[in-house]
């Protein structure tokens, strides 16, 4: 053991207690939870792989802890020498163990956060971390604050709430790096841990829970963390839909009941109407074809039918409970007539395939008669979707099913009105109200699927059409004015543009067949048609024309997505031009949605300039909409990471410009963030509460507008920030070479975490790289360059220009929510960063003539960090958020081991001349096997690298992603 005296080594438990700050508060059980999980895991590790392997884990942990304490690079080299001496099988076990320990640390944190919330001792404040963030978006507290502090009347709050909509759009962006098999086991570990620390637990319960905990920890460790094949879009959709089944379905009515209670507590004796569109759900899974050739028209059709089948099944599973509950015989005359008619027409043998209420329901139970008919239709709706999905045809006639949500709501509303008329309102407001709210929220399609496609693909189709029609030069070469004129002439006319003889490439067929699928499926399957890389009005008009040509009876609303900096700047003028077109103004009926992209704008210009440009673009778009009398909904394409616009929900909403939310908000919930938002019932409740409360508060108590001098300063700073960012990322001739050497970007695709390719085009530089792998690669090395690059130059410029600007920046931080959130998020990223780790990657992987470039970037990191602290008035990082600070310190030592393992593994993969001396196997399980390391290595028999290296690398990627709690 490298000459160490194991007996003298501190146990990991003791190390933890030395490493972590003292309790942050009286209710702080984090270290206790973490130590228990770790203790159980290390015992399991020893049972499975022997004492030597456990001791190696402890040695690595101790070296990491020593590095974290003093930041001495020599400790990283010591770690490297231990890690590179491991044989392939041991290397996989060790990297898997550290990845597993980080997942356990995350679970301990989640249980601690839930514990702190339960006992309501949470200090109020603006925490920058989602899970540290306080309950200031508690719906009841928000109502009370609006009434008592801001003088709003309860009626004003009720009116605003009834007309408010938050639409959460689940996307399958490949950022969920944890397999579903593991997520489920993690959920059970979380449950066991929470119950173990519950009050009044008996010794027997405790023993059984402890056994369950150990079983689940072992099951998670013995599960292969690595996806051996990439998920298909259908896999992603099923994974996304599983959250509806597990938490969202029951979470929505539960949350709406809490809203009712909160309203009652401010004097409103009415419930939120069941059809108030307070919460809506949409999805991109199977609809987002932007750069993803695997999302075909057939995939879109399949996911729509699958979602309809799942929705019908969820209703069907609930309807019998409702039939049990509504056993009353009193009803209105109108209701009795309907029930008697249904009873007369019912067949005696029609219900044999049901478990409950399988005989003819007597007319003395009228509610059950009506609900029995609803059950029949739900059964047929589900089976018809199943048959269409499996065979493409169904023998169940459409009239035997529910074809639209109004048909479904009608008998339920009839039941509700009848119960209320007969004095049974308390019964009507029970499970029936919950059911009505579910139908209003989820409809028959569970979620509405957005379609997203690149503007260029529509141009290709119209180019083919104009060439086929032989109309002068090709559409692609026309001016914007020429395109608009022709598109409007066609939209105003009636003649079909093309027939079956149109010559089509595969790409053109794909676009047209997608519109065909939209025309064939029920219109409530779909939400918006989003055009990515939109730049001009013709992009929107082109989609309107293609919808008409492909016979879409209820055209989807068309949403331009503005992403790059130049497109954001030009967006208000493009939208104004659209609104000035009479045909278009009549088409939209006073409503327009515009999507703004956080990821690509950040990759294009850096975080500071992107954030400020997004802010200004929203202000200008709102002015344009007001001028033309259009209600504008902003759709925020935020990622999970700060580099892609992520951050705590309530702060993100409250820092938007005044008048840009107006009770209507759409926002993406991406990959890994879905699990953090909806993975557990209490997380689902918290997410719905935060979005609803913050949207209401933004409308009723808008944030302040920035002072003119703040704007002027930030305008200048943004120019400087963009210049520095682009001078490094796009103009430095060897930057791409440095990026590919210093990070695991080239190896990212091996993780199989999504169906979408990591590049828009197979070759090319940073421009062609998607925002997710771009951020992911820098996150892995803990350097986070895309987030902070440009900030330092901007702050330096401002202070150098006038020393008083520092005071102005500090005032902006104190008074302006947008600026505060921007700075706080950067501060959090610095707390998660470590230039010493990035330096190790450089030393091992980057050619010597680029070392000076890396050193210059790291000096920039340190200078930028100090300037951010100065602006925030902080001496240390995260001094205002002790909980997050504690949690990061707890994770750092695990992450450091994985970083060192990753850097040395990349060295072994990339450098054929790098030789290491392996020590004998240390894992007991491997020693007892005649097949040696092949037992673990055979899981990946096709790897092009030396045995075990690829799996070790992927495990380190997953572990670091888990430790930093955001991937891409």
Swiss-Prot record:
Q: Which UniProt keywords apply?
A: Allosteric enzyme, Carbon dioxide fixation, Cytoplasm, Lyase, Magnesium, Phosphoprotein, Photosynthesis
Task: Tell me the domain of life.
Answer: Eukaryota
The UniProt function text for this chain reads: Through the carboxylation of phosphoenolpyruvate (PEP) it forms oxaloacetate, a four-carbon dicarboxylic acid source for the tricarboxylic acid cycle.
This chain's protein is named: Phosphoenolpyruvate carboxylase 3
Annotated compartments: Cytoplasm
Give the matching HAMAP family.
PEPcase_type1 (MF_00595)
Q: Which Pfam families match?
A: PEPcase
Q: Name one GO molecular function term.
A: phosphoenolpyruvate carboxylase activity
Q: What's known about how it's activated or inhibited?
A: By light-reversible phosphorylation.
